[in-house]
Amino acid sequence: MAKKPIYKSLYFQVIVAIIAGILVGHFYPSTTHVVDGVKEHIPGLGEQLKPLGDAFIRLIKMIIAPVIFCTVVSGIAGMESMKSVGKTGGVALLYFEVVSTIALLIGLLVINIAKPGVGMNVDPASLDTSGIAKYVASGQSQSTIEFLMHIIPETVVGAFANGEILQVLLFAIMFGFALHKLGDAGRPVLKFIDQISHVFFNIVNMIMKLAPIGAFGAMAFTIGKYGVGSLVQLGQLIICFYVTCLLFIFIVLGTISRICGFSILKMIRLIREELLIVLGTSSSESVLPRMLRKLEIAGCEKSVVGLVIPTGYSFNLDGTSIYLTMAAIFIAQATNTQLDVQHQITLLLVLLISSKGAAGVTGSGFIVMAATLSAVGHIPVAGLALILGIDRFMSEARALTNLTGNTLATIAVAKWVGALDKEKLDEALNNPAEVDRKMLEADRPAHA
């Protein structure tokens, strides 16, 4: 088979799109004019391209619920034993809790050593909090009980209509169990769901062709609205956060991957296209449907992939966990709020719960941060205004770390519950281009 020209690869197209987006945003930025003493915001071409990125994310979110439903149902209903489903869920939740706790601790450790907020001497009363009002309102409405109750949908249709991943996942698990109990009588339904999943994955392939356009629009908006110059003032926190994410990926996740018998670098190469799409869109959710199919081809059983990946988007957001601890302590440092060990332990315990409410979409981490500061009470919520402008620049590292963490979690859980084909995984890690080819072939309709 002739090798596909590089310009036709999604990998290359997304890189070009990101670079083009940065250039457009930089050379056609938004400006602010003062008219009669009133600041007037004039959006530049870069900011005006925001709908391109938003449209791509909406197209992906449109298909996530049915893809998850079909994947989970066919995975569970097709299993021989229901005990293995419970075992997989238990191992996954234990893994999520341990690894996300490590992520929170690493963020806490690094921010206390680097102290990027010390010396800013910001008076919380002087901050303009108008920009954070909607996040604070959203954050204050969340609680642990409400979050858990929210997992149970009021109606099945509502869960799908609103794109509530955990609600769809709960219904899919129940549907899969019920279908499994029917035995042979449920086979026609299972076959239909399996066939319709191919239709949904074909839609995903169609949408992914638009990924370069989405990445271009999202990147042009970010640079055009906030500008590269806006990074300078709070650059120390951004650098600190990016370095911490890299340390977490290559030390913590790297150690777990070695325990599982493979290299973290090879795994990153396997998901390089997805990482680039995430880099452009700042949302790890944008590649969720692709990851379901890719990890299945890479040797993980469908039932494991269907359970671990969607659940991980709420319970295993390592990048978001690092961000939450670092941002909270940074605000305390910048506003000269004294935090003793007891305060920091309280913050950690609150984050262990509140961080589970973040979804893999842009802005969710900021809402959880508002909820956390409101719950802790000691750190001024007004301090969120300090990081509002740079939050968008940190969302890329958050999303990339989240995706890497969830990919490893799926492979690790599959290995530990005996649901991993090691030969397929090795083949995928050594030849990622072949996996991408198989993904396209798997979703082509078979003609007799």
Swiss-Prot record:
The keyword Repeat does not apply. The keyword Membrane applies. The chain crosses the membrane at residues 9-29, 59-79, 91-111, 159-179, 203-223, 237-257, 312-332, 345-365, 367-387. It is found in: Cell inner membrane. Pfam families: SDF. It is a multi-pass membrane protein. One of its GO terms (biological process) is L-aspartate transmembrane transport. One of its GO terms (cellular component) is plasma membrane. One of its GO terms (molecular function) is succinate transmembrane transporter activity. Gene3D superfamilies: Sodium:dicarboxylate symporter (1.10.3860.10). Its main location: membrane. Responsible for the transport of dicarboxylates such as succinate, fumarate, and malate from the periplasm across the membrane. NCBIfam families: PRK01663.1, PRK13027.1. This is C4-dicarboxylate transport protein. It comes from Acinetobacter baylyi (strain ATCC 33305 / BD413 / ADP1). The gene is dctA.
